[in-house]
């Protein structure tokens, strides 16, 4: 039997909303279980960044985004959570970038802290939203976010993961030429506990 165009549109919308709700539920469950995850893995960041770039290559290629990385560092923490944090930051930088833009991850060791800077060439984040973007469900541009998928929890999850590791995350720089998000993490759990 043929489906009427209105019915097909309704079914497509229903499927999209179901997928969005499923993703939101999964993310909320992840956030509620963060504190139970052991943070005892030895993590080499450069290979992890390369893995994230490989995982996000189809999205970057679709948007004509160049992925670059520089530096390395080793830390103690949850391999799974640090991967998720870097993945979310990189994915956002790709999704909200300009066509033919660049996403660059730079890792430096500064006074027993690893500083990971994720820089893009997107349109920037208005100053009044730079702290709010780490709150659950916050979106700078609600219509654009819906086009790009997601449920408004990615950066909130980033903030939670960084806090769990004794670090901080902030918008270091943002203008119409792009944004740099800086994540500062202790290199070991002893530093976290001080």
Can you name each region flagged by the protein language model?
Residues 41-54:
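A conserved beta-strand-to-alpha-helix junction within the catalytic ATP-binding
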Residues 166-167:
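Conserved glycine-rich
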Residues 120:
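Acidic ATP/Mg2+-coordinating residue in the GHKL
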Residues 93-94:
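Short helix-loop "hinge" at the ATP-lid/N-box region of the Bergerat-fold HATPase_c
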Residues 125-139:
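Short conserved segment of the HATPase_c
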